[in-house]
Amino acid sequence: CLIEALKKKKKKRGMEINKIYNEDCLLTMKRLEGKVNAVITSPPYNIIRPNVEGRGYDVYKDNKTNDEYIDWTLDIFKGYNSILKPNGVVLYNMSYGTENTVLMSLVIADLIRKSDFTLADIIVWKKQMATPNAMSSNKLTRIVEYVYVFCRKSEFDTFQCNKSVSSVRDTGQPNYENVFNFITAKNNDNSTHLNKATYSTELVRKLLLLYTKEGDLVYDSFMGTGTTANACIIEKRDYIGSELSEEQCKYAEKRLNIRISQPQLF
């Protein structure tokens, strides 16, 4: 198995690199302290109404109360703080639900107030298409989502970003290139019955090029069908992922084996 060979090449103090762990991310992060350069992930958006079944994922039930969801997110960011190397970033793709438009803002506010992280940037991701909001007389069709760039509060002026120097002033002060906080990328790499809420390899590749370097270790706490890992292989980054669904882990491994064995197909 090609992906098994890739895993065996590298370990971080006994933990396999380039592997998706079929477990809760809070368990994985206990073994990753201080080893990760960046987190790139898209959490469940908590868009399913309580007592409603059958949307989004094959295992996870995306229907917490607002308070439960916020507390859960705070616990996850405590884990991120423990695993990130100095000046590492969290790139957190999140959007709001049609019926719960405030949760996203509540989460961000509590992260800033109650965690060691602050919001460094907001990237707008324009997707190629959007489902028309034909049932609403007053809500717009949403064709954008957001990637929230979080850094530690103590590293607001030093967190990793790959902006290059375009010129240097007489005083020695560098001028950096102009990089817009706007990315156009595909919606996804085709959703599956296992996970209807995936993002695209194209989006993740652009984020990797902005915030990581070749050989960096990237962690995805909600790996799903392996999109972050897929992008990492292309851009020569190492990855570790967590995923609750055994079936999604199996799907991702098959997908990544194809990526490794037949890169010319992509």
Feature locations, PLM:
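Class I S-adenosyl-L-methionine-dependent methyltransferase module
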Residues: 253-266
